[in-house]
Structure formats: C-alpha cells, structure tokens
Amino acid sequence: MEPNSLRTKVPAFLSDLGKATLRGIRKCPRCGTYNGTRGLSCKNKTCGTIFRYGARKQPSVEAVKIITGSDLQVYSVRQRDRGPDYRCFVELGVSETTIQTVDGTIITQLSSGRCYVPSCLKAATQGVVENQCQHIKLAVNCQAEATPLTLKSSVLNAMQASPETKQTIWQLATEPTGPLVQRITKNILVVKCKASQKHSLGYLHTSFVQKIGAKSLPERRFFCSCQTLKSHKSNASKDEAVQRCIHFFACICAFASDETLAQEFSDFLNFDSSGLKEVIVPQLGCHSESPVSACESTASKPKKRKKEEVSGAQTNSSLLPPDTVSSNLRKSGLKKPVVASSLKRQACGQLLDEAQVTLSFQDWLASVTERIHQTMHYQFDGKPEPLVFHIPQSFFDALQQRISIGSAKKRLPNSTTAFIRKDALPLGTFSKYTWHITNILQVKQILDTPEMPLEITRSFIQNRDGTYELFKCPKVEVESIAETYGRIEKQPVLRPLELKTFLKVGNTSPDQKEPTPFIIEWIPDILPQSKIGELRIKFEYGHHRNGHVAEYQDQRPPLDQPLELAPLTTITFP
C-alpha cells in the first residue's frame, strides 16, 4: 500500500520523468552533503566549506556617517524595505532629562535620534512607536564614514552653466557645514543643498547608475531627491533639462576634479547632457611637432598655429579666465624636442597679440573684492578712504545687474546728484548715482566670485612689536576638502587670541538705530570718448576681540624712533 500511496502523491504531469539523476548537484568533498553546482559554499552550516568566491556585488552599506563640520551627527541609512539604492537621513543627538529623587535632582543625558523617513516621522509624531525604528538602530551602530570629494574652482569655471548656478555651487562649497559632495556607496552620493521643508537637514541623496543592455546602448540614469521620480522611460530625453539640477552639476564638478573619478564616471562626463565642455578633463600630453631649425620658419608657422589655438580658446573665453588660457598656450610647448634653435624659438614665441589680451568682468570684480580684503586690516581704523576704480560702462552695467538680483525690475539708485567740477580735473558737469546696500547678504551676493568670495570677517594675530598679521584659520579649503576634514575631526585646532575685523553693513549692534550702508557711487563718462566712468565704494568695518566688539586703538610703532647706531671707528691701512 505504501508504494501506491506514494505514486498517488506524484502529479500526473511528472509521472513520465524517468529515473532521478545527479544533474545539477554535487557532493561536498568535506561532509558529503548534496549542494547545487552553482552554490558558493556548502549549505551545511556546520561544514561551511567555500567552493568558490563569487563576483557578486557587495551589499550596500547599511549606514554611513556624513561629515558635517560641526557637532551635528547625520547618517545616511539604507531603507531595507525599498531596495539597495533607497536611503534616508537619520539625525542623532543627546538630550538632557531631569529626574527627581529623594537626594535631589539628577540630570542625565539620553541619546536621542530622529528618522526622516516619512512613515517613521508620522509614527513618531503620533506616538505610535515606543522603541527606536530600525533606521536609528542602524545609525547608532554605524562605523563607516562618507568620503568627501574635492571641488576645484578651475573645473567650476570651465562648466557650461549659468553664472547663478556657479555662484550657488561655490557658496555651498565654501560654507563650513561639511564638504559639498560626499560619496556614500559606488553609485550614491550626498550633496549639500539649501535647507527647505523637504530637506530640513540641508543634505540630499543623488545616484549615478549606468545599465548596459545586450540589445540597446548603455543607459545612463541620474536621480536626485530634489526631483520627482518618473518611471516612464520614453521621456528620458525630454527630461534632460530637468535632470540638470544644481546638485547634478556639483557632482559632475567633483568627478572632473579627480582623475580617478573622472575615469570612473567618464560616460557621464562625456555625455551630451552633462553640460560640460571638453576642457573639463585636461590632456597633459602635447601634440607632436616637427623640429624647426631656423627662426624665420618659426615666425610663420607657429604664428598660424597660435592663432588657431587662440581662436579655439575664444570659444571658452566667457568661462575661462585669460590667465588659464595663456597657461594652456604655454603648456603646449613643454615637451618639445631639445634642438639647437630652442632658445631662438622661445625668443620668437614670446610675442603677444595685443588684441587677445583681455580682462573679464569676474576677474576685475575679484580684484575689487581683494582690495576690500586688504582694506579690512586690524591695524587701522574702521573708516577707510573710498576705493576708487576707473572702469568701462559695460563693467558697471554688469555690476548693476548684480545689484538688481532678486528684484523683478532694475534697482534705481537711492540718490542722483548733478555737480560741477571746477577745482580738479576733469572739468565739467557730471552726474553721480548712489546706491545704499544695507543687507550684508546682498553685498556678498554682489561681490562674490568663484575665484575670490567675499570674506565678511578677517582674522589676525598680534605680533610682539604691536603690529598685526593676517591669520589664515584652517577652515574648509575647497581644493582639499578630504584632508582638511580628516584633520579637523582627528585633532582640535589650537587657535591664538581671536582678533577679527568684520564688515559693518546694516544694524550691527542692538542699540543702533540707523543701519550702516555699503555705498556704491558711479560717475559715468569721466572719459567720454573711451566710455570710462568712476566707481567709488565706501564702507566701514569693526573690530572684534575674543568675540566682543572692541574699540580701535592705534598700536602701531612710531616711525620717528631714533635708530641706535654703533660709533664709527677709524681704520688705518699701512
């Protein structure tokens, strides 16, 4: 009866399979347990023999600590229930709780956490979850740390993006709230952003994924938390403009700033939707040239080649400063073969085309910002003489456009004055337009450039002779974010006596009634034929000593101190 009962349990469609074989299975050489031929290790847990090491992708890191540059502890945690590429943020902190006892009040510190997954936030606000969620538990046991990526200003200048995008990226990169881009996993990065209701911590996740299909071309996908996820694949080409968010450009800049990352993400850098020019990844090699033995031939052929190079550089002149263009021209002749006429070639190649020597508006504005930095010195009083610049009308038009940023219409001057100049050159009747800026953020927005951001405060140290010297505080350097943050977290920085100067704009003290303005004056057509006008910048700055406002004290050594010289002696020669 037993064989018949077994036969009845076999389904009808499996009745003609025949005798069972050992195809697809094999014995473990150690314990004899049958395992599948594709198995990596023995399924007998007490045995644990490893057959081969698979090349499978390592599982995504559960929790990674983000570098914030402060006491804020933020973690990027994987959401297990959604997939390996879905991550959330968890914030850990310490809260103080008082407990009343018979002996008195005891203050204890309790570790607290906040998970920013919508479901966990909703459950926490409603008081449904008594214990910590799984994301907070993963963050508490986290031992991994994110890798900060370097951002180079030269790469940012070479990006084909709007000036507002570059400016925002630079402002985020120079803020002391951690590096701009941090790598969490192979494809996922964390980027700083402006704090909002959706991203209250000021961070968001981005992912770069490339899928290679057998029948189709490689598919490159970029997703940012600031965008809504669209599952329709046919609209991928139409959504390229949407994908070009500021966080996408920040990641691309970080990739291009590192040679290893540039090779790893070369498909995204070379992709048309990246918005980058070919100068992003510079080629260090030089073109092979035939050696020239006479200076006459170098005077004809290299001139033509130089014109071609300069014309090629003109296409990027709106993004690259002239010094980088000239440096690229100089680099092209580094690896030439050494011949007898190399000295003659260098002498003939030093001629410059005057028509190609230009100064961009951002380079000039960077010089204005540097001038303001030099003026804000602790050794002098906070009321310097006005800074005077003679610039073309087009430069002031660009500056006035920056003054009007944030308003729908062009901002009108606070006052317009007509005056007659009789006692100084040039003589005549002129008009003076004056703008009063009373918001320090607007002043920074007007004067900030990628190469020279405006420093609202400047730190100094006092020398033994009473003079003051500029102190470079070890803050976040955009060119070496990884080294800087590693040093800050490992060892606290020893700082001397804090002596600072600060730009006085607006109300800088509680009892101040009228705000201190940052004044911009413009007198057009000082040189009417050349269309050159006169720009005057007036401002004040204050002094801080250990965080408190200090009155200016002139402690400079007097210049009329008598010098003590040794008496002269007479030397006789035989």
UniProtKB/Swiss-Prot annotation:
Q: Where is the composition biased (Polar residues)?
A: 312-330
Q: Which domain of life is it from?
A: Eukaryota
Q: Where is this region: Disordered?
A: 288-331
Annotated Gene Ontology cellular component terms = nucleoplasm; nucleus
**Which residue stretches, if any, does this entry annotate as coiled coil?**
none
Q: Which Pfam families does the UniProt entry name for this protein?
A: zf-tcix
- The name under which this protein is listed is Uncharacterized protein C2orf42 homolog
Q: Which organism is it from?
A: Bos taurus
In the record, what lineage is assigned to the organism producing the protein?
Answer: Eukaryota, Metazoa, Chordata, Craniata, Vertebrata
